[in-house]
Regions:
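Alpha-helical transmembrane segments and their immediate juxtamembrane cytosolic regions
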Residues: 1-180
Length: 180
């Protein structure tokens, strides 16, 4: 993919991670994203351009994983943030290691069942939109750590500038993003 697209996708994954930290309803958001992801798979498979594990699937997985980490850490924000950072770095490092091995001729499987985990396991599966767990979820988890650093006091970093403030278009698109 082109570099600008990669940058935008990286930023979006990072912001989803920040949103995980800020949100009070990650279980609900994750389930809702998973349902929409399954609907997208169903519709696109009928159209002949199947999306098997796209960005929305990955977001659903990442949000639910963050919810699980937060639950296991008993909603202790610092503990959750540190575990998320360590796991995020580990996911990216593992992907880097296995991707390097794959590029050097090592093949891990021909079983197409595990394609959603990582590029190095996709065994030739094609998808119209493809964001595997490794490394994508790692960036989301690291974003949640930065959510802790930036929003620990739960105060916006952006000023309110009146009723018709500069962020109104972003507020609107943020509210309807899942539907778009």
């Amino acid at each position: 993919p082109p570099v600008p697209q990669q940058v935008v996708v990286w930023i979006v994954r990072f912001v989803v991670g920040i949103s995980c930290y800020v949100s009070r309803s990650n279980w609900k958001r994750g389930i809702m994203a998973a349902v929409f992801a399954m609907l997208i798979t169903l519709v696109t498979s009928q159209l002949g351009m199947t999306i098997r594990f796209g960005i929305l699937h990955m977001f659903a997985f990442a949000i639910l994983l963050w919810w699980l980490i937060d639950t296991v850490c008993r909603h202790k924000k610092l503990r959750t943030a540190v575990v998320s950072l360590v796991l995020g770095i580990a996911i990216i490092a593992i992907d880097y290691g296995f991707s390097s091995a794959y590029e050097n001729g090592m093949r891990f499987t021909t079983d197409k069942t595990w394609f959603f985990v990582a590029d190095w396991l996709n065994a030739g599966v094609s998808s119209s939109d493809y964001y595997p767990i490794f490394p994508s979820v790692g960036y989301v988890l690291i974003g949640s750590f930065f959510g802790y650093l930036l929003y620990n006091k739960r105060r916006s970093l952006f000023p309110r500038l009146g009723r018709y403030s500069w962020h109104a278009p972003f507020d609107f698109w943020g509210r309807i993003a899942l539907w778009v």
